[in-house]
Amino acid sequence: MQDAVPVGTGAMAAILGMDSQQVIAGCAQAQATFASDSGEVVEAANFNDPAQTVIAGSKAAVEKACEILKAAGAKRALPLPVSAPFHSSLMLPAAEKLKERLATTPIAAPTIPVVNNIDVAVNTDANEIREALYRQAFGPVRWVECVAAIKARGAHTLVECGPGKVLAGLTKRIDAELTGLPLFDPATLAEVKAALA
């Protein structure tokens, strides 16, 4: 990924307190301030909850978008400490390398439904799964829609596996009827087991 966007040339920022459509419009406005051949890019990268959208792109364009969005009423525009502008079109070169690797990676049909975060679909075909994994490297994470799709399938509790509890917290902010539980160590495993018993 660092080959695609060298450290220090890309950026991400969380935009808080603003509707995602306003964020998208602000990104377009920011990008329009640069020459079309400048290579400056800023896009919505993560739709985390109804009032939090993460933007990503080239450093100058992200900074300009933050300036525009704060002036337009965003409560906060927080630069994120990341090494690359993930889920943006600048990651396409890295995605192409990922696609090559995925072509030779065995993938079986899931035994439980998995909602992918790029088009909010449940893929069961190995090639569809590969394509979704490829596209998610340079396309936005549609977490708000994923949570709605998971709920529509009858889920009431979402378990976040891995370090931290960001998604569990976002889930609660997206839909208060859902429970989000983090699972990252023996103590949280016990909590999840108790909650699901």
Task: Tell me the role of every PLM-derived stretch.
Residues A103-A197:
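Acyltransferase/transacylase module recognition
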Residues M1-P140:
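Alpha/beta catalytic cores of group-transfer enzymes, especially the acyltransferase/condensing modules
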